Amino acid sequence: MTGHAPLVGVIGGSGLYKLEGIEPVESLNIDTPWGRPSSPITLFKLPSGPVVAFLARHGVSHQFTPSEVPSRANIAALKKIGCQVIIAFSAVGSLREEIKPRDIVVPSQIIDRTKSAHAMFGEPFDTELTGLVTKSIKEAVTGFEMNDRIGVHAEKVAICMEGPAFSTRAESNMYRMFGGDIINMSVLPEAKLAREAELSYALIAQITDYDAWRESEEPVTVAEVMATIAANVSVSNRLTLTILDEVHNAVAKGQLKTCKGTMEYSVMTKKEMISEESKKTLSFILPYFS
């Protein structure tokens, strides 16, 4: 691997399979106790010099459905190569009139509607990181052409449902009553696993549609979603050029309180009662279990 470990990892969602406009310097195939990640990890050199890591959540050919994504391997591999922070992109549906297609949301909370078995936690997103990312995005979009069409929203609630699937109209309205603002299929278990690996995590959610709750519209179709995803990809690439420098510098200077050390006393089982095999597996991401 290159001499400088990447502090920041980027997970690309649907349509974002590489970072445009940034020089790729190395491709890594990382083996983890949970298998290989969904794509090779590509290291990109930012114009200012630092290296960042990128992987495609669904694979470079979008071969993994939301329920098939090897999230444990993805998170473990990014942790292994030195990442302390993850910026994840995802295509999402809007559950609110004021959050329009092509808008950007940096959520602060999640409601879990998946079938995963991980325990919930109080703050699924790093609050300092989401604040920095939101500020950086707002500054970036002011320079975009037709920037008035791209709203930026923070302090919103993401619903994560089991996928691949789209909501019925009744389900969509139920999620609105729950207090959800956006809906997707990928933020979990990703956010939970990032916390377990002591990685700060923030989601940049790009709106593709209004889900199915609007009575005045036909239910969302795959064609509709894919058309908006294509329009969002160029925005994603322009945002990465702006925000990755800021996030890297904040981590390098110690301005973000990362999650390092938060899991050391979070396992209730006495260390001597944990099997050697489990310790070996855990030590891949948490060295104090070795």
Curated annotation (Swiss-Prot):
Q: Where in the cell is it found?
A: Cytoplasm; Nucleus
Instruction: Output the superkingdom of the source species.
Output: Eukaryota
Enzyme type, top EC level: transferase
Kindly state a single biological-process term from the GO annotations of this entry: purine ribonucleoside salvage
What EC number(s) has UniProt assigned to this enzyme?
A: 2.4.2.28
Sites binding phosphate sit at 14, 57-58, 90-91, 186
Instruction: Provide the protein name.
Output: S-methyl-5'-thioadenosine phosphorylase 2
The species is: Puccinia graminis f. sp. tritici (strain CRL 75-36-700-3 / race SCCL) (Black stem rust fungus)
